[in-house]
């Protein structure tokens, strides 16, 4: 059953394919018209790849890291006509860095929660407050202050209730 509510012509890159990615994908299919050849899922674990293969959606088995995210994501978000979109449903990927890249590429961005690169929470060289969720929230607000305007980025929309619930 489909109930198309929108059309998206650009590339869509979903980062992560755990429980939220698996729950969100069928809802995107139900409500958003998109070109499957421009949809790609990136995740370090391919245990659910069969769900993408049966939908003819491209899969890249790779972790998105601080060292590779620009090189990995830029061609995926700029390949072909239309503005790109990042759907970040992963952990251990810096939401702020990914938002900033999306902004650089004039791509939309959405995530369920603000995340840091691995190691922030356990970095003893930082104070407890510098390792807190409050500090992560402030880093998103700082990005907004430093780079006002531009294409929309939605952060911390939640998962379920949140991103999944919006589309049900």
For every predicted segment, state its role.
Residues 150-167:
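Conserved anion/nucleotide-ligand pocket segment
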Residues 11-26:
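Glycine-rich adenosine-cofactor-binding loop
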